[in-house]
Swiss-Prot record:
Protein name, UniProt field: Flagellin B1
Source organism: Methanococcus vannielii (strain ATCC 35089 / DSM 1224 / JCM 13029 / OCM 148 / SB)
Removed propeptide positions: 1-12
Pfam family, one: Arch_flagellin
Keywords: Archaeal flagellum
Keyword set includes Disulfide bond: no
Length: 215
């Protein structure tokens, strides 16, 4: 073999080797790009899910619309029952009241009440305070449904547009036949997830009606 032929063969072998290395580099780059694209898509989906969950966590919660008290109309009668009207916050996810707690503070005592049962009053024909006459114990609250467009509250779940009253018997909780005049009461309805609905008021100087607007 002449020197010229040897050099030509050597150049040919080098060219094939370079081509193989180049193809290998292209394949590695393609695999790496595919991994990066898949990882990027996964991270994007995870970030979107996390962002949605965070938004729901921030937006979720309860709003207290008002508080009414009940006394039987006799002289020196105290507020023996109380109804706390609540609705989900705007943008809130569904709230499960069966896993919610009611905190009520009065006269240095804080009582924690759990869900008892639910009564449908959406027809508007019932006295809201009659809902408590189902034997609700002092450690539990009763839910009276006032507005429910999708029948979700039957299972104790409220969502957008629902309005319920959380009814308790203060005379059983605090004794002394309930809460007298000029007394401070505070509390919150704490859902399992989200912000609580907070209430705070002072009872009137005199009780002139059976149903009293407290907040």
């Amino acid at each position: 073999m002449s020197v010229k032929n040897f050099m030509n063969n050597k150049k040919g072998d080098s060219g094939i080797g370079t081509l193989i290395v180049f193809i290998a580099m292209v394949l590695v780059a393609a695999v790496a790009a595919s991994v990066l694209i898949n990882t990027s898509g996964f991270l994007q989906q995870k970030a979107a899910t996390t962002g949605k969950e965070s938004t729901e966590q921030v937006a979720s919660g309860l709003q207290v619309m008002g508080v009414n008290g009940y006394q039987d109309g006799t002289n020196d009668a105290n507020v023996s029952k109380m109804a706390i009207y609540v609705t989900p916050n705007a943008g809130s996810s569904a709230i499960d009241l069966t896993n919610s707690k009611l905190f009520v503070t009065y006269d240095g005592q804080t009582h924690v009440l759990a869900y008892d049962d639910v009564t449908d009053l959406t027809t508007g024909n019932s006295d809201i305070f009659d809902a408590i006459n189902v034997g609700t114990p002092a450690s539990e609250f009763h839910v009276a449904v006032l507005q429910d467009n999708d029948n979700s509250t039957g299972n104790g779940v409220i969502n957008k547009g629902d309005i319920v009253a959380i009814v308790i018997e203060t005379s059983d909780i605090f004794g002394n036949d309930g809460i007298p005049e000029r007394k401070s009461v505070s509390g919150k309805v704490q859902p399992e997830f989200g912000a609580p609905g907070v209430f705070e008021f002072t009872t009137p100087a005199t009780y002139t009606n059976k149903v009293l607007e407290l907040q």
